[in-house]
Amino acid sequence: MLAIKTLNQFYGGSHTLWDVNLDIAPGSRMCLMGRNGMGKTTLLKCIMGLQTVRSGGIEFDGNDLTKCAAEQRARLGIGYVPQGREIFSQLTVEENLRIGLGVRKNGPRTIPTRIFDLFPVLKKMLNRRGGDLSGGQQQQLAIGRALVLEPKLLILDEPTEGIQPNIVHEIGDIILRLNKEEGLTVLLVEQKLPFARRVASEFCVLDKGRRVAAGPINDLTDEVVRAHLSV
């Protein structure tokens, strides 16, 4: 579904991603891991067209993403939940959700009822401003907004950051449910090991912009954690 091939990226004069290769199969749940500042968010931004790629390729469902504008990538079926959520605090919950409808390739211009099935709190707070929601509720709104697209691939950048434990568990349940019931492919950046081990089927570790370990989540051993993830 998603193939990243020998990807290199620079930020100013700094070489931030070095010959990164990553294949994400349809229906998989890939967790991108690494210490802070190792290139995880940069890689997601390259996939979404928010950072330029110096060399290498990114293919999604047979499409060369390096030749697609950022909004075009969403229309191809990629939902994106950025770090920090980036909801519109002055807009209502409903207005935030409707923003996603504008880039849907096909289908009705109405919020899918599935969103409220997954996140009942959003239905109760439709007319509340996004800025009035708690951090956990805002994260649910950000995920809901991405799912309005009915994507094939959902990308989440640290979805548990700053979220209360009960909401973290709910988000994990929803990711697993969407994957099992709808075959949704998931790529997430995550720092919390218990969450990663619960939700992911596969992992990839970046260290100083290089891929240093990858495989089934059961291969995420204590040795790998000590070498590349421990602070």
Question: Model features per residue range: what roles?
Answer:
Residues 33-35:
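The feature captures the beta-strand-to-loop junction immediately N-terminal to the Walker
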Residues 48:
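Helix-to-loop junction immediately C-terminal to a conserved catalytic motif
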Residues 56-63, 76, 108-110, 215:
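Conserved ABC transporter NBD signature motif
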Residues 129-133:
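Conserved ABC ATPase signature
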Residues 146-147:
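ABC ATPase C-loop
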Residues 150:
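Conserved catalytic motifs of ABC-family nucleotide-binding domains
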Residues 169-183:
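Helical segment within the ABC ATPase nucleotide-binding domain
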